[in-house]
Amino acid sequence: AMAGTATVQGQGTR
């Protein structure tokens, strides 16, 4: 998963 806003993968910077 890549950093940033939440994606369809359900990961990201929160």
Curated annotation (Swiss-Prot):
Keyword annotations from UniProtKB, A to Z: Oxidoreductase, Peroxidase
GO MF term set: lactoperoxidase activity
Reactions this protein catalyses: 2 a phenolic donor + H2O2 = 2 a phenolic radical donor + 2 H2O
Keyword Cell wall biogenesis/degradation: no
Lineage top rank: taxon: Eukaryota
Disulfide bond positions: none
EC number: 1.11.1.7
Family named by the database record: Belongs to the peroxidase family.
Protein name: Peroxidase
